[in-house]
Amino acid sequence: MKRLSTLVLSTILVLSGLQVKCQVEYDKYFTDNQLRIDYYLFGNADTVSYALDKLVKEPKWGGPRMQLIDNMNYGMYFIEVTLPDSDVMLYSHGYCLLFGEWQTTDEATKTTKGFHESVVIPFPKEPVEVTFYAKTDLLEPVEKMKILVDPNDYFIKPAPKLPYEVLNVYGDYPVENAVDIVLLPDGYTAEEMEKFTKDCQFFVKSLFSYAPYDRYKDRFNVRAVLIPSQDSDVTMPGDRLYRNTALSCSFWTFDSERYCMTYDNETMKTLSGQVPYDQIYILANTKKYGGGGIYNSYCVSTTGDSYASDVIIHEFGHGFAGLADEYAYDGTDNYTLDVEPWEPNITTLVNFDSKWKDMVDNKIKIPTPVKPKYENKVGVYEGAGYQTHGIYRPMIDCLMRTFRGDKFCPVCQRAIERMIKYYTE
């Protein structure tokens, strides 16, 4: 239910010029702590400005220590951490943002808004430069902001120790060798914390009920921060129902009824920073169907709907593995058809070699007709990424398209496995 997917150049290696992109030795440059960089994005459909908010030192870096340079090249935004006046890259990270999705809305053509966002990096031992990039619709990287971080700067605030219980839901594996997920509750009152802990167990059960996650149970840690809300359930503006909740999740995000997200980035990141994390997942205490997932940003899923298990996994496909939605609508044109999308499970055939061409039997037609004889065949089926024409998906059905098949296709499974290994090896 990711509202918008955008595109990537197959020649993305140019995005850093001549900078050195080999993996680096973690302990040489970084401490065990995490640096959170809070910033603002101000803009509309056509323009954007960046402004630094603050720097926060958090207790524990939750990301990888071996794979510090992000060679996935996923996402519409990325950061690079370098030594000042040097071509030596220490860390890079790709991601997407709620702001980027908002820029595609009709509202963005009429008004200017500001969004609070954050990135986290390993806490440096010496001064570093952090450069922020955004990609155009043609996936050309554009530098947006550069800051110098001095780890001895007394304006770097230590993260507050919050008075909320932390629950170890699943796993006790080394942080550097695991995918660390933090679960946050929204719309659970203090009296409903027991329900939240049960929903956390439901999350874990759901996660490991689907391939390929079921094969990697020893590579995940799941922790939860037990923050109560004043009100039960979450906000539903279209029904004139407004709840006071810990994370302010709301349906009708961008005026799309089922899209349930939060604009309160600072609260979300402050709570998440109480534990080491790679991925943030908000469980919304409501029976209404909905949710959302943004790559390397956060996911939301409701817990009371009969499709809750499927929604949890579908949204995590967006947030964790960068998977695109494979369903389509008439009259949408989110993708530029002469550019290969960055998401691993859709293609414009501009650079199909970089996608799943190696998984297609040479007897399968490309594009592949949607016919019963191809029902379980990896092919190239038209209609994906919200567009009925010019964008193709790997199979007739998949969890990223509908919940009828109740499983990921082989292409999505491979993409998920690659991401698990990226974080854990």
Model-predicted segments: where are they?
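Beta-strand-enriched, solvent-exposed domains that form extended recognition/catalytic surfaces
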Residues: 29-154
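Fold-level signature of zinc-dependent metallopeptidase catalytic domains
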Residues: 155-211, 224-234
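Solvent-exposed loop/turn segments at secondary-structure junctions
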Residues: 187-190, 228-232, 286-290, 306-308, ...
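Active-site-proximal segments of metallohydrolase catalytic domains
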Residues: 219-295
